[in-house]
């Protein structure tokens, strides 16, 4: 049974509708996680540290796709809610075209200057060659990866979250199989990991292009794009929080790596990489919920349905709070197993990773509220508040904590920086929720 954006959502219906988006995000995060597991265990900790050093740049560059996907889907969903389907398809086609062109330009520039980039991100010695090789191969599929990020949001806006899930599952399974083949069997090393990811990203980014070009029964399909500067700027504004989130995360992750290189050397970077890979999967569930729920919120906001906005807000907050507690408990219980999967071959590195992950996991209790808060205001077409929450959460507070806490607490200050930053962001998010309730009528 297909669930429409216009329906009233019970807990069961809301979770059924959003679950495909959550699974999509989890499988997307698996790309880098599987690479990390195979590289760490089959190639070694130097190669593993190299992937961790270049990953912030690659994820930062792909932020264009998240910005256009989340910001554009909010605007397109609002337009659909207003009953303007033809206009919505024109906007959709324009935004995908812009993402493809922008992705191609960034891919070419990144490929050319990759060696300089990896050195700027802290690579030294033999790590430079590892980083450059992995980065340049990844650039080949960077445009497809951006389109994949765009379509994650637009599949939901089109009323086809299950189809988006199938595409991502296919891409994720491809990545896992090829990692095992290229690294475990053929021993291609770090290049094998990059080729596996490249292939899976082509599947995730290009299959949706084929679908939306063909006749389909979804709410969206490709038409002749007409450039509308106002719509593009509004999309950038709406999606600025997601852009800021990804760019800030890239900068902060690079800062974490630089700090850890000073305090603990290569082992510190490898330990942080293992923690972040697990974090990708855990946080992906919150991101998936936010992505899946945003078009529904935008639709009812565009339709002026205040009662359903209240319903969606209250149910979402309850779900996220409960899930945060579950993730925190799971992280504490599974920390030994998860750490051993990545770095079980080195006793000292394993101990550092285990301790770091348990401290880091405290943030899971509240991180979901902050992610939802930013996405919620994006869905309401209030890009400014969304961007402020995202800017404080992913950049300002984390940078301050990563730079200052280690002065007093050493490496423990690095592990606890995320929790303190999320707590400070929660205070600001709560203030925005309270102050904006009369304007948007969600409380």
Predicted regions and their residues:
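Short alpha-helical transmembrane segments in multi-pass integral membrane proteins
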Residues: 1-18, 76-143, 185-240, 297-363, ...
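N-terminal transmembrane alpha-helices
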Residues: 6-43, 56-71, 75, 79, ...
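Transmembrane helical elements of multi-pass membrane transporters/channels
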Residues: 16-35, 137, 171, 200-204, ...
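Transmembrane alpha-helix boundary and packing residues in multipass membrane permease domains
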Residues: 21, 25, 37, 41, ...
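Helix-terminus/linker motif at the lipid-water interface of multi-pass membrane proteins
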Residues: 30-48, 118-125, 181-188, 250-277, ...
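Small-residue-rich hydrophobic transmembrane alpha-helices
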Residues: 48-108, 145-164, 271-335, 367-389
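Hydrophobic transmembrane alpha-helices of multi-pass small-molecule transporters
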Residues: 60-63, 175-180, 205-209, 280-284, ...
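Short runs within selected transmembrane alpha-helices of multi-pass transporters and secretion channels
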Residues: 69, 137-156, 167-175, 193-206, ...
């Amino acid at each position: 049974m297909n669930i429409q954006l216009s329906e009233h959502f019970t807990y069961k219906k809301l979770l059924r509708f959003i679950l495909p988006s959550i699974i999509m995000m989890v499988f997307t995060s698996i790309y880098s996680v599987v690479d990390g597991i195979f590289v760490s265990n089959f190639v070694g900790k130097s190669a593993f540290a190299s992937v961790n050093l270049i990953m912030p740049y690659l994820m930062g560059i792909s932020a264009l796709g998240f910005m256009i996907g989340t910001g554009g889907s909010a605007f397109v969903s609002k337009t659909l809610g207003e009953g303007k389907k033809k206009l919505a398809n024109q906007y959709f086609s324009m935004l995908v075209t812009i993402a493809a062109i922008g992705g191609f330009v960034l891919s070419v520039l990144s490929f050319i200057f990759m060696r300089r980039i990896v050195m700027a991100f802290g690579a030294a010695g033999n790590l430079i060659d590892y980083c450059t090789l992995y980065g340049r191969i990844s650039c080949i599929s960077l445009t497809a990866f951006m389109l994949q990020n765009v379509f994650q949001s637009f599949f939901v806006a089109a009323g086809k979250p299950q189809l988006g899930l199938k595409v991502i599952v296919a891409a994720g399974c491809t990545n896992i199989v090829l990692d095992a083949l290229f690294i475990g069997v053929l021993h291609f090393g770090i290049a094998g990991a990059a080729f596996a990811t490249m292939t899976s990203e082509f599947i995730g980014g290009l299959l949706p292009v084929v679908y939306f070009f063909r006749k389909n029964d979804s709410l969206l399909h490709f038409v002749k794009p007409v450039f509308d500067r106002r719509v593009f700027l509004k999309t950038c504004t709406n999606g600025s929080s997601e852009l800021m989130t990804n760019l800030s995360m890239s900068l902060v992750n690079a800062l974490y790596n630089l700090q850890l290189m000073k305090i603990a050397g290569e082992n510190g970077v490898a330990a942080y990489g293992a923690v972040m890979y697990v974090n990708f999967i855990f946080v992906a569930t919150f991101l998936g919920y936010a992505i899946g729920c945003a078009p529904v919120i935008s639709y009812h906001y565009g339709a002026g349905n205040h009662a359903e906005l209240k319903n969606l807000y209250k149910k979402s907050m309850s779900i996220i709070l409960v899930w945060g507690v579950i993730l925190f408990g799971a992280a504490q219980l599974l920390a030994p197993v998860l750490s051993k999967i990545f770095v079980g071959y080195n006793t000292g590195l394993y101990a550092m990773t285990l301790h770091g992950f348990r401290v880091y996991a405290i943030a899971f209790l509240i991180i979901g509220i902050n992610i939802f808060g930013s996405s919620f205001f994006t869905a309401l077409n209030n890009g400014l508040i969304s961007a402020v929450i995202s800017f404080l959460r992913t950049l300002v507070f984390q940078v301050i904590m990563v730079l200052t806490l280690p002065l007093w607490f050493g490496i423990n200050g690095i592990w606890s920086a995320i929790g303190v930053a999320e707590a400070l962001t929660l205070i600001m998010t709560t203030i925005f929720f309270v102050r904006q309730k009369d304007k948007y009528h969600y409380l």
